[in-house]
Amino acid sequence: MKVTILGAGVIGVTTAYQLAKAGHDVTVVDRQAGPALETSFANAGEVSFGYCSPWAAPGIPQKALKWLFMKHAPLILRPKVDTAMLSWLVKMLSNCTSERYAVNKSRMLRLADYSRIALAEVRAGTGIAYDQRMQGTLQLFRTEQQLDASAKDVKALAADGIPYEVLDRDGCIRVEPALSHARDKIVGGLLTPKDETGDCFKFTNALAAKAVELGVQFLYGRTIKDLQVEGGQIRGVVTDQGAIASDAVVVALGSYSPLLLKQVGISLPVYPVKGYSLTIPIVDPARSPESTVMDETYKIAITRLGDRIRVGGMAEISGYTNDLGLARRNTLEHSVMDLFPGGDVSKAAFWSGLRPMTPDGTPVIGATKIRGLFLNTGHGTLGWTMSCGSARVISDLVSGHKAEIDTADLSVARYG
């Protein structure tokens, strides 16, 4: 079968690799000059199978109001006349209940755990290296209130059989020795030891090279204009350099997916939520993290990537903008220097990317009302984490097979 994948980020490339392994004739189309040059370029670097939660959670509306007035706020909202933004916000607020949180977190953990297995198989089968470490994620709490609030996450982890460990201050320092200088600033943490870290850009490029060896064709520098549909069946893709005939098409365009799908009558509640990162060269390993630490106060991930520290986080709801705000950089610097001052921030690279967020936190994976048109998008902050499992699911569905995990609640049909 001739399959065209739209998007060469980590989702598109892992999907291409799995479909090629399944024997399909695969073409990947992207407007950039190479793979992983947009949202997958400099993300936080965490592969967090256990630290995997929807942003829509009980208490978030109240916290959001407080965050809007914080100097180092994890949330930035820039309201505008945008019906897509308003609709998305309303849908997200409707998911901020205990009942919806439990449902959404459970299915996210299901997909994330499947991705853990799939990533291990890809790594074993290809031998690719990407500054990976397998030392877990430490969710770090600065207040007793944060520690107490983690009970709902502990309950979900236990229910899904995900290993975890609740730590006191000394336990956190045992896991991350560099925190010893900041012991008075922390009260405890939640460790998910099966989590990993790695450079998503390096991984995606290395896997793209393996996909080429399997016969995948990458068409870079092409802007996708439209989808060709006849009689309810996908027929191809229209680009600025001509049409590409296809038996099946997988849309993996991240935040830009709904803009394309709207043209063929599919409503997809995915909206861009901008995140920022700093990549800092390490000058003092003793004051640098061993793995990933989530600073719960600022919602910032601090990750060790070889001889670099990647600091990523925040949520800016401002539409399709990639501008770099100095205040956001200051927040990232404040968090990392407060906990892990082992890098030279004067030489840091500052970046922003648009995360494709759904209102319930779960990605949209599966078939659509148009035969042969599939979606693999909306992974939010967890695209790197969920990529390999999502790719396996799509490969099975495109091939006409039953997926190895339950996918009934992952498709766009859940939104009505």
From Swiss-Prot:
It catalyses: a D-alpha-amino acid + A + H2O = a 2-oxocarboxylate + AH2 + NH4(+). FAD binds at residues 3-17. Its EC number is 1.4.99.-. GO terms for molecular function: D-amino-acid dehydrogenase activity. One of its GO terms (biological process) is D-alanine catabolic process. InterPro entries: DadA, FAD-dep_OxRdtase, FAD/NAD-bd_sf. Transmembrane segments: none annotated. Oxidative deamination of D-amino acids. Belongs to the DadA oxidoreductase family. This is D-amino acid dehydrogenase. The lineage of its organism: Bacteria, Pseudomonadati, Pseudomonadota, Alphaproteobacteria, Hyphomicrobiales.
